[in-house]
Amino acid sequence: MAFRRIFLPLIVFSILVFDPIYGQKFELDSNYVEETPELFSLRFYFSKKYTDLIQKTADGNTYRFQPNSGNNLGIGFTYQKLTLNLAMPVGFLNPDRQQDWPLYLDLQAHLYPKNMIIDVFGQFYNGYSIPSDFLSNSDSPYLREDIKLRKLGLNFNYLFNGEQLSLMAAFNQSFIQKRSAFSPFVGFEVYGGSIKGDSLLLPAFENQRESNFSSNRSFQVGPNAGFAGTVVFGGGFFLTGVFSGNLSLAYTQWNESSDLDQWGIVPTYFLRGFFGYNSRKFSINANYVLKNNQMVRLDNFD
């Protein structure tokens, strides 16, 4: 692991950023980070978010289930400790989306207080497909409007050098990183989710009887550690990277059967990168976030 055309917009991306440590004193190092609380920032952006399910079968084939999401067009603003971004998929950016499939909702909050990294996920996808590139016996995508995925998660980390390294500067430009800085961090994460269809999920024409399933539930929790850093160059350009690895105690159940469940330890990782240019009047950047969640292996299920 991981619409019927209507006139009301579908909100698929929402971020609310605030500093929850109101009662604590945390001073930034002004030699490294410039705080700009008086500025009101307005942004226009493109985004693409999705949660895939990747199933590896006993004979070595790989099937990738992809949701009926798409390319989003959005607007947002930042003022002091509040950031709000709203976006939706628009038709001219998504000519291949299934227009009559159910609505979906993908809520992600990426919070960067001055010495913390917090990620919250609430994903509710309806309708998945397997592209033809992942099918051995078909030249057309395999469409399943009935497949539903639900995923909830929390990732929390403490940034040791938060007074010199601001991830807010890379993410929403409410701060400006003036000099390069780096920091290790430690924390924990917890995730739970399910995927279910009205019948077996893999197509019958693929002949994967032993590795086929109609539902899956999973849960995992464990500690993680990582490293973050920003390199500043060229009078305002920056390159930020954040990577963490995790070992989680995990549980997976297939086909709602107590005979097909398993506890185990699984490795996961979280990768994000930011590149752009920041100033008090203008900012442009590109962001990439990838969260990998593994399931416990069980016989023919991987």
Role assignments for model-derived ranges:
Residues 29, 108-216:
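Outer-membrane pore/translocation modules
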Residues 36-42, 71, 80-82, 114-118, ...:
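Outer-envelope beta-barrel architecture signal
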Residues 38-40, 67-73, 78, 101-105, ...:
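Residues that define the transmembrane beta-barrel architecture of outer-membrane proteins
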Residues 42-50, 77, 86-90, 111, ...:
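Transmembrane beta-barrel strands of outer-membrane/channel proteins
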Residues 44, 73-79, 107-113, 154-160, ...:
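Residues on the lipid-exposed face of transmembrane beta-strands in outer-membrane beta-barrel proteins
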Residues 49-72, 83-99:
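Surface-exposed strand-loop-strand hairpins of Gram-negative outer-membrane beta-barrel proteins
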Residues 58-63, 91-95, 104, 137-145, ...:
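Extracellular loop and loop/strand-boundary signature of outer-membrane beta-barrel proteins
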Residues 269-302:
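Predominantly the C-terminal beta-signal and adjacent terminal strand-loop region
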